[in-house]
């Protein structure tokens, strides 16, 4: 199994764009300035990853909009299915899906052509945003311990839905796994 470079970059760049938008909304809806400014770091890092991955498409002379377009519908459906009931569930959704997909994409990027592999791996390195989200969730749970069981169940559900998004990035002999 190896990813199609255009499909891999189209999906990952579009999802990082959506993660940036989600993190910005989380920051906007935060209850205090400390949380708002911390989540702004997540939005900034997601947007930087989007920019780096989209730039790789530009370098390959692939229209970034055309490369991302096939992933708009499935991504928005995924977001609809996984939208949390409240702010904490939405932050948990971003954390679980981002952590899972980023790890998955790092492993899948090993199958990309050597000419772009380094750029992609560099765009995906680092876990600051994952740690920031996790720390915020841990802080919320410490303030309100009754959140823990509900978030644990929510995260289990999210992993299943996120696996379906990950599976759609796989290509075997130019046939996408759907």
How should these model regions be labeled?
Residues 1-10, 70-94:
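Acidic/His metal-coordination segments adjacent to aromatic residues that form catalytic metal sites
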Residues 1-28:
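N-terminal topogenic module of multi-pass integral membrane proteins
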Residues 4-9, 32-48, 90, 115-129, ...:
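Alpha-helical scaffold segments that form or flank carboxylate-/histidine-based iron centers
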Residues 19-40, 82, 98-113:
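Helix-loop segments that flank and shape redox-cofactor active sites
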Residues 42-71:
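Conserved alpha-helical segments that form or flank metal/cofactor-binding pockets of metalloenzymes
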Residues 106-163:
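A contiguous pocket-lining binding segment that forms or flanks enzyme active sites
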Residues 165-178:
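C-terminal accessory extensions/subdomains outside the catalytic/core fold
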